[in-house]
């Protein structure tokens, strides 16, 4: 039973990340928290531009982010997010949305940075049901 080492979640308005991060840090003070954003969001210092990953990403930094204790930001391309949407559907039979695909891609990056066997948790906030007309399962 190892303690939780990392939390990885997308941020749109920031509410999900902030609420869960604070609760988990109370229980696990050494917890590393990583925000997931699509390429085109500005949290990592890049310029804002359009992206296809729905539900996460910001065009301005919300004021409460200044006081938030997080380890880093993982920027995930639309291509990687949608790759994992398709991978999860094909291999696990789950219909996740693009922000969930981005969360998985970022979680895999973070897992490589953690010690072997460390525990990590993420959030899959969306399903792909509302995006089926956008042909997200086509390669």
Residue ranges and their predicted role:
Residues 59, 105-139:
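Phosphate-binding loop/pocket of nucleotide- and phosphate-handling active sites
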Residues 9-10, 35-37, 121-125:
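Short beta-strand segments
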Residues 25-98, 135-139:
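Active-site/ligand-binding loops adjacent to catalytic centers
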Residues 10-21, 99-107, 131:
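Short glycine/serine/threonine-rich phosphate/pyrophosphate-binding segments
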């Amino acid at each position: 039973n190892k303690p939780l080492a990392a939390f990885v979640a997308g941020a749109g308005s920031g509410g999900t990340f902030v609420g869960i991060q604070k609760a988990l840090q109370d229980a696990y003070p050494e917890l590393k928290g990583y925000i997931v954003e699509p390429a085109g969001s500005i949290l990592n210092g890049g310029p804002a531009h359009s992206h296809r990953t729905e539900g996460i990403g910001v065009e301005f930094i919300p004021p409460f982010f200044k006081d938030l204790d997080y380890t880093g930001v993982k920027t995930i391309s639309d291509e990687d997010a949608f790759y994992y949407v398709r991978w999860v559907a094909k291999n696990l039979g789950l219909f996740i949305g693009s922000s969930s695909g981005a969360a998985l891609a970022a979680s895999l990056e973070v897992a490589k940075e953690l010690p072997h066997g460390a525990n990590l948790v993420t959030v899959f906030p969306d399903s792909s049901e509302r995006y089926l007309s956008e042909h997200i399962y086509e390669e």
